[in-house]
Amino acid sequence: MQTVSETFAGTITVNRQMRLALPRMAMSLLIMSYLVADGVLISRFVGTTALSALSMSYPLTALLIAAGFMIAAGGGAVAARALGAQKHEEALRAFSTALTTNVMLGLTLGLLAWFGLDWVFELLGIAPEQTEFARDYQRVLLPATPLFLAAATFEVFYTTAGRPKAGLAASAASGITNVVFDILFMGPLDMGMTGAAWATALSWFIGAACGLWYFMREKSPLKLELHLPDLKLLRTAAGNGLQEFVSNLSYVVAIWLYNRVFISHLGTAGV
């Protein structure tokens, strides 16, 4: 297996750039595809009110994702720069810092949101008829936030390590898990929104487990060694990823505003 340095050695041609970029693009499209499938299946098995509850509560999930991607993207940039300077140990520290920080961040924010769900739902403007659906979904999903942020960190570092195809395979496994268990839990087992949340949580677990297995192997191009976060690298990573956070935050605010306008003028059916 090539090392990371060997992967990026030599002249970087357009073809080489595309070989690295296309799997990452396909990964993003795949993630969006199974999110759409998730919504379709919820509408089919649970109903349109449940789907609107998912849409109304989504800004909460998206905000947690935005915070995690800031660290993941920033950490990936720090690691890539270190690899370019032949500082392999610094790249490994950046990887460990991004992963451990995101797991701790996901655990902290997820639990805070879990205990403050009623206040969050009021802020988001969730209607009374949507509340039970949203609560069933978020009570399962929020404690699993560390799994998603770990999987998101691994997605970034597959590309940093020069192995975007491995990331695409992990995303495919995660997406297939989500759809299969959506059908099983909401169909034959009739678990409603709780089933949809468990299917999503299981898909996050698969994504995190794939990344952990891949990067903990001895032959991994960027072998993960878990340590406490390096605060200096963490500050740099957060600074590098700030643009990613602001971009995602604007998306969260836009969704929240659209939802508030739609529900005030069209009711739950319009969300």
Describe the role of every protein-language-model region.
Residues E89, N102, Y158-I183, T194-A201:
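Alpha-helical transmembrane segments of multi-pass membrane transporters/permeases
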Residues V46-P59, A134, Q138, A197, ...:
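Small-residue hotspots at the loop-to-helix junctions and early N-terminal turns
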Residues L20, R24-S28, A62, N102, ...:
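Residue-level signature of transmembrane alpha-helical cores of multipass secondary-active transporters
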Residues S33-S52, F121-P128, L184-M191, F245, ...:
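Helix-terminus/linker motif at the lipid-water interface of multi-pass membrane proteins
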Residues L63-A66, G110, N178-I183, G207-L212:
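Hydrophobic transmembrane alpha-helices of multi-pass small-molecule transporters
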Residues R24, S28, G39-V40, A77, ...:
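Transmembrane alpha-helix boundary and packing residues in multipass membrane permease domains
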Residues L51-L111, F148-G167, N259, I263, ...:
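Small-residue-rich hydrophobic transmembrane alpha-helices
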Residues M1-A21, A79-P146, P188-L242:
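Short alpha-helical transmembrane segments in multi-pass integral membrane proteins
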